């Protein structure tokens, strides 16, 4: 798949704010600061498409990006960020679970996992949740460039044993065009 056009479309703080377009949605989920926005910028080839920050919890809305005028990339707020109040945390959790459970346009959930910490409890819980829902999901091991080759292999093996139902597992660095092309090839299968 080649991305020729990508632009921010809308942010939603509630289900009522979701776009009405009935086009495929590929959802990017993961812990806070795992690199979701960086990955979206890398995939689209547009620096600054999705706002990035070194501060965890910066993405606080469901952000939709229209790609090739044919489908959405959806950037979810990260989970596991504790610096928000309990009420805010519960509101996000309800919004995200309702969105993932009820949104029929979702064709794939891409779960980003920090390759330096591939066995986090919150990531395993998300894998179990997606498996329970029967949602197709793939795993992207981010920040791959920060590992040695043996650490990459170990991280991948951990994910292969944890995510038995994953459609794919990709080791990803935003500096690698090979990883980008591999991931785009997987995503192309979910754009109907």
Swiss-Prot record:
Keywords: Cell cycle, Cell division, GTP-binding, Magnesium, Metal-binding, Nucleotide-binding, Septation
Protein name: Probable GTP-binding protein EngB
PANTHER family reported in the protein's UniProt record: ENGB-TYPE G DOMAIN-CONTAINING PROTEIN, MSS1/TRME-RELATED GTP-BINDING PROTEIN
InterPro entries hit by this protein: G_ENGB_dom, GTP-bd, GTP-bd_ribosome_bio_YsxC, P-loop_NTPase
Residues given in the record as GTP binding sites: 30-37, 57-61, 75-78, 142-145, 172-174
Cell division keyword on record: yes
Pfam family, one: MMR_HSR1
Organism of derivation: Chlorobium phaeobacteroides (strain DSM 266 / SMG 266 / 2430)
GO molecular function, one term: metal ion binding
